[in-house]
């Protein structure tokens, strides 16, 4: 399954369809229709959160899905498919790719990422596993553990990389990631325009994931209202 899945997403756009519990669009049904709309627009894959959303999306579309499970634990900052329990639950949906936090941070219950990956590969040998990384150190770590794909998902979202953007310094972090691993790199995180998506693919990324810029209306609206607000601020000077 691995090679055919990789061919399907190569050079394409994966749309992240997620809405958390405190967001207006939080609904498996709504996410399934969001995914359908994304595929109709040309998306070659979908990234989705929770088994419930994934199964609803699977009933609507027939493209590869990157599955995750966002869950908070009191004893760790790791929240993207953080423990073996969540990894297994997402694998059981039959998604082609499962992504998980692959930072060097302490995991909930002191679970070990190497042990998680080793155990789950025995249970689901045909599933591909994607490492959501923040720093270059994370990339080396994930590479050494044998992840199938490396994502830049958490760049700008960890304590070490806080407030950084993938496009900073002419995409310097992404360029370093591409030099640091021979595994397929999936660009993800703060890719908020078509031009950015095109540029990361031109640099050599295998595929690109875009989320909020496509599927979070409140974020899209805020970008417009922030610009409009500047008119009032300029007039007030």
From Swiss-Prot:
GO terms for biological process: carbohydrate metabolic process; N-acetylmannosamine catabolic process; N-acetylneuraminate catabolic process. It catalyses: an N-acyl-D-glucosamine 6-phosphate = an N-acyl-D-mannosamine 6-phosphate. Keywords: Carbohydrate metabolism, Isomerase. One of its GO terms (molecular function) is N-acylglucosamine-6-phosphate 2-epimerase activity. Its EC number is 5.1.3.9. Signal peptide: none annotated. It is an enzyme of class 5 (isomerase). PANTHER family: N-ACETYLMANNOSAMINE-6-PHOSPHATE 2-EPIMERASE-RELATED (PTHR36204:SF1). NCBIfam families: PRK01130.1 (NF002231). Belongs to the NanE family. This is Putative N-acetylmannosamine-6-phosphate 2-epimerase. The gene is nanE.
């Amino acid at each position: 399954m691995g090679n055919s899945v990789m061919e399907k997403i190569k050079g394409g756009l994966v749309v992240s369809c997620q809405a958390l519990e405190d967001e207006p669009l939080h609904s498996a049904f709504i996410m399934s229709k969001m995914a359908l709309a994304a595929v109709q627009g040309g998306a070659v894959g979908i990234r989705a959160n929770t088994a419930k959303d994934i199964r609803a999306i699977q009933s609507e579309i027939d493209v590869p899905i990157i599955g995750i499970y966002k869950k908070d634990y009191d004893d760790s900052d790791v929240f993207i498919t953080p423990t073996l329990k969540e990894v297994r639950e997402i694998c059981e949906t039959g998604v082609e790719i499962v992504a998980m936090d692959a930072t060097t941070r302490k995991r909930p219950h002191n679970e070990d990422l190497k042990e998680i990956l080793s155990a789950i590969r025995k249970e689901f040998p045909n599933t591909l596993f994607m490492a959501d990384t923040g720093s270059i150190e994370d990339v080396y770590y994930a590479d050494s553990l044998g992840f199938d794909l490396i994502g830049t998902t958490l760049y700008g979202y960890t304590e070490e990389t806080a407030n950084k953007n993938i496009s900073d310094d002419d995409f310097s972090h992404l360029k370093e990631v591409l030099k640091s691993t021979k595994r397929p790199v999936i660009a993800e995180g703060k890719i908020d325009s078509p031009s950015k998506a095109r540029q990361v693919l031109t640099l050599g990324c295998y595929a690109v994931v875009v989320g909020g810029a496509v599927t979070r209306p409140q974020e899209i609206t805020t970008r417009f209202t922030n610009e409009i607000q500047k008119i009032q601020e300029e007039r007030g000077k």
